[in-house]
Amino acid sequence: MAPVLSKDSADIESILALNPRTQTHATLCSTSAKKLDKKHWKRNPDKNCFNCEKLENNFDDIKHTTLGERGALREAMRCLKCADAPCQKSCPTNLDIKSFITSIANKNYYGAAKMIFSDNPLGLTCGMVCPTSDLCVGGCNLYATEEGPINIGGLQQFATEVFKAMSIPQIRNPSLPPPEKMSEAYSAKIALFGAGPASISCASFLARLGYSDITIFEKQEYVGGLSTSEIPQFRLPYDVVNFEIELMKDLGVKIICGKSLSVNEMTLSTLKEKGYKAAFIGIGLPEPNKDAIFQGLTQDQGFYTSKDFLPLVAKGSKAGMCACHSPLPSIRGVVIVLGAGDTAFDCATSALRCGARRVFIVFRKGFVNIRAVPEEMELAKEEKCEFLPFLSPRKVIVKGGRIVAMQFVRTEQDETGKWNEDEDQMVHLKADVVISAFGSVLSDPKVKEALSPIKFNRWGLPEVDPETMQTSEAWVFAGGDVVGLANTTVESVNDGKQASWYIHKYVQSQYGASVSAKPELPLFYTPIDLVDISVEMAGLKFINPFGLASATPATSTSMIRRAFEAGWGFALTKTFSLDKDIVTNVSPRIIRGTTSGPMYGPGQSSFLNIELISEKTAAYWCQSVTELKADFPDNIVIASIMCSYNKNDWTELAKKSEDSGADALELNLSCPHGMGERGMGLACGQDPELVRNICRWVRQAVQIPFFAKLTPNVTDIVSIARAAKEGGANGVTATNTVSGLMGLKSDGTPWPAVGIAKRTTYGGVSGTAIRPIALRAVTSIARALPGFPILATGGIDSAESGLQFLHSGASVLQVCSAIQNQDFTVIEDYCTGLKALLYLKSIEELQDWDGQSPATVSHQKGKPVPRIAELMDKKLPSFGPYLEQRKKIIAENKIRLKEQNVAFSPLKRNCFIPKRPIPTIKDVIGKALQYLGTFGELSNVEQVVAMIDEEMCINCGKCYMTCNDSGYQAIQFDPETHLPTITDTCTGCTLCLSVCPIVDCIKMVSRTTPYEPKRGVPLSVNPVC
């Protein structure tokens, strides 16, 4: 009996065992069985598990905010990029959060990092440790929605980490004269004490201003202040601190370690004697605030202050911090941590990594009074630290030279709000180690004497003007913890930033110079910012290739003026006509597309419009063009015009436009709605003969360049472009919008619906949804008409997409929908993004990057994961019992590494230097054309197959399902581990990669065996090829 071809074979049926099927009845399963199922598939911690995870020597990243590229892009796309953004108002350093998230969404990670470091020289540190829930995130407008606020800290960390991986140095402000040509004031000696966040920030901004003799004196043999010594490695790795210090040193700032501010060493008086013109005090609060009950207790007995304990942990866990490798403190048994601030929680989670079996965090007040940010408290809770509120320490019990317990009394708050201690309620808590985290003070008399003659306030801290950070001595400034205004790293950074401007103002005044009334601190610059992105086309010089399309962003010339002020290189006017052809628009007329599904807000992948050309007169446009050219002579203004098929009309309007001073004309032969009914726009642009004649008429009428704007709504766009060239056009715009009907409501009425009758017409679809059509049009024209200028438009929403069009053969890029999604300031992102893309092409060490995207390392939730298969020769998913096995294997490996006691290698920063010429815009135009051809030119011998990275796989089975129901049934799906496996029947179709939610979890690799298609029935004849 012949096999039934339309039924799956037995081996395929086996593969399909877990493939979804339409439900035909309710499912029955006992509660006890479901509990077992739940346990097997559980990814989050079991609420019934009370054991601490073994964390000894595990200093891997534990932050919930950390993001990989996939997570960063999704989160950045979700951001609303609000007007007058509240998040920015809540940031102590006033980061332009809206703009840097815009850059991340556009895959311009350099642009995002530049924006961050411009306002915060410690942008990566703050991205990792900022209490964002109390700052920027607390003001996020998405708090008013179901999905909640944006993970701003994670996005900031991601962008700056990518920039760190680029290994590109900071440079002086390119607009400054060389150091030797700066005025004498910029050679003034400036000293800073303490190499912590406040001083690093202050020194960075002073160096950016142009000061060349800046020295930081640091008491310790390491730099970074509390960022190095007291914030644990699992929250802030030392290589991050070192990276930001190296950026500062790129500008010539010097650091001298082993030099302290003390009456026995360096004082303000001796500093002045040595010719220093200004000083900044950023020494933090160096001494612990120690309760009297701890007097006489030592570390050997089991007592530490946070000022003792955290630096010891840092030295034992932070590679590169010190020249030597110190062991971690040996903590065993039960640990009591006293305090309720961020430092107390850092002590608690660090104690677990030093071997503590159990940690109690004890504090005087209640949970609602905890000063630590929720992020820190949540991490300690997840790691099974215990919280004991309403307890005040009374006595430490020592036996046999070791701490064995502590006594506490209960605290209560009375009706007046005062806290009282009840001596009748005693609590006895056994412990092996006690860590006091009651804050820090400035109490060393030698340090205070060294600061003489500055005044101190009632808290024993330097008295400063909170606006200028100036002390009672005009030449001395202070900031950070030592002043008492800053409570966080980012606030210390801002203290240094604030002080830098007023130090600048003070120093200049000493040399008889003045500064601007409004503070103007320089931005962050690197060699990327020096890349030239100007381009010449049709004899016109464009300062950059980005311009406004003839569309809604050019509704008025005042809008074009604002666009030029923002940085756009050129603009087309909204298409205008002779007065006899003037139009009046309908409303509603511009709507969001349906191509993004139920996604509302910015980032729409398409819009549909039934808007006609400009309602303004030709006289308005011509006068305005004259004004724009007078005020912006370096910007290109192109007048977009439209007439019916009438030589006299085209001649008249073209001459008027030329006389206005326009650099060039665009002939709109492509408006897909409304104008065609009037014999204009599309009515002219679909016929090569009409296009050829119109171009001839205009060529005869004007001397300036002109470009025909083509419609994609034709069978062969090349024939239209060729006709335009034959008619004398200097180039073409490709393409206008695609004619479409965006959607119908459930009652059959359209949207947009005009008037009571709810009528509509086919409109023009724009946005990224039409990019594939536009790319095809541009490449087709560029291949057929080599060297013929093309102004690309159609889905350009970033530097990355703009580069695609340049590679396709376009010379300049018109933008509309992206501005509708955002605003004119996206131009800054586009320019920095394009500069970065060009610059990175010259760095040999980054050739495995895709644009600004680094090569993907195996990760889960954005954090690198160890390859379990390499540790135990077995593949394990990350859920249920397998997750517990993974944790156990990782814990054992961490202990093994600790026992090996391998010395830390010193950190070395090697900046990448271009080894190839940095390409210009001209160099990249048409680069992709060599790869395009006919299907017959493609090799059917060089086949690929899919390869899955099991460590990155999240076991969703999307690859399995699409392969089953849309492909070749070539993926097996394990019923217990949900690990997919590619079989040898894979045809390399790439559907699995296309639907996989994890970037680079699936890769296509070369097939190692010959590919033999399954024909179903043997061929009756031999194939021709």
UniProtKB/Swiss-Prot annotation:
Residues that hold [4Fe-4S] cluster 1 according to the record: 79, 82, 87, 140
Gene Ontology CC terms: cytoplasm; cytosol
Active site: 671
Residues given in the record as FAD binding sites: 129, 194-198, 218-226, 235, 261, 480-489
Enzyme class: oxidoreductase
InterPro entries xrefs: 4Fe4S_Fe-S-bd (IPR017896), 4Fe4S_Fe_S_CS (IPR017900), Aldolase_TIM (IPR013785), Dihydroorotate_DH_cat (IPR005720), DPD_II (IPR028261), FAD/NAD-bd_sf (IPR036188), FAD/NAD-binding_dom (IPR023753), Helical_ferredxn (IPR009051)
GO biological process: beta-alanine biosynthetic process; CMP catabolic process; dCMP catabolic process; dUMP catabolic process; purine nucleobase catabolic process; pyrimidine nucleobase catabolic process; thymidine catabolic process; thymine catabolic process
Ranges in coiled-coil conformation: none
Tissues showing expression: Found in most tissues with greatest activity found in liver and peripheral blood mononuclear cells.
Sequence positions that bind [4Fe-4S] cluster 2: 91, 130, 136, 156
Cofactor annotation remark: Binds 2 FAD.
Reactions catalysed, as given in the entry: 5,6-dihydrouracil + NADP(+) = uracil + NADPH + H(+); 5,6-dihydrothymine + NADP(+) = thymine + NADPH + H(+)
Keyword Metal-binding carried by entry: yes
N6-acetyllysine sites (modified residues): 384
Main location: cytoplasm
Domain of life: Eukaryota
Pathway: Amino-acid biosynthesis; beta-alanine biosynthesis
Binding site for NADP(+): 340-343, 364-365, 371, 437-439, 481-487
Gene3D superfamilies named among the record's database cross-references: 3.30.70.20, Aldolase class I, Alpha-helical ferredoxin, FAD/NAD(P)-binding domain
Residues bound to [4Fe-4S] cluster 3: 953, 956, 959, 963
Cofactor: FAD; FMN; [4Fe-4S] cluster
Binding site for FMN: 550, 574-575, 709, 767, 793-795, 816-817
Function: Involved in pyrimidine base degradation. Catalyzes the reduction of uracil and thymine. Also involved the degradation of the chemotherapeutic drug 5-fluorouracil.
Disease cited in the entry: Dihydropyrimidine dehydrogenase deficiency: A metabolic disorder with large phenotypic variability, ranging from no symptoms to a convulsive disorder with motor and intellectual disability. It is characterized by persistent urinary excretion of excessive amounts of uracil, thymine and 5-hydroxymethyluracil. Patients suffering from this disease show a severe reaction to the anticancer drug 5-fluorouracil.
Family assignment from sequence similarity: Belongs to the dihydropyrimidine dehydrogenase family.
Protein name stated in the entry: Dihydropyrimidine dehydrogenase [NADP(+)]
Protein source organism: Homo sapiens (Human)
